[in-house]
A protein has these predicted regions:
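Helical substrate-recognition/capping region of FAD-dependent monooxygenase/halogenase enzymes
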Residues: 1-146
Length: 146
């Protein structure tokens, strides 16, 4: 499917029967794993799944991925759509106190994960690209078949 752009890595091997068990991964094409994170402002527990969907693409990044936020804003404007962005890390809107997101996301703090409105991972980057806006625009062009 062109609605998924792989990152060049092989699909992870399943430890258990994939037909019977869910194995959390952010490999493109997989459903975004659920992890609990916490809203920095009030400590409320929030699922990563509740932060995406709602008819929009969502981009998750870490404390070193601020350039992805800027790229998503610019690319979203170019495409005439909003791309929601959530930075998860210390002193950000959402924090990962127990480390569940850090264990599940499979990218560095400068990388990102782009999630489709149906909660499936469309693409991920392990680290910050030299030109995040161009990279994200290329990915969105592929996903949206433009």
């Amino acid at each position: 499917s062109t609605a998924v752009v792989t990152d060049g890595q092989m699909e992870p091997a399943f430890d258990l029967d994939a037909e019977l068990h869910f194995q959390p991964t952010t490999w493109p094409g997989a459903r975004l794993p659920h992890t609990w994170i916490f809203r920095e402002s009030n400590g409320d527990k929030v699922s990563t799944l509740d932060l995406c969907g709602h008819g929009q693409f969502t981009l998750f990044t870490g404390i070193g991925g601020e350039a992805w936020r800027e790229a998503a804003t610019q690319v979203g404007a170019d495409f005439g759509m909003a791309i929601n962005v959530h930075v998860i890390g210390p002193r950000q809107e959402y924090v990962d106190h127990v480390g569940d997101w850090a264990r599940a996301n499979e990218v560095s703090d400068t990388g990102c994960i782009l999630v489709r409105p149906d909660h499936h991972v469309a693409w991920r980057a392990d680290e910050l690209s030299e030109d995040p806006k161009s990279e994200l625009a290329r990915v969105m062009n592929t996903i949206l078949a433009r």
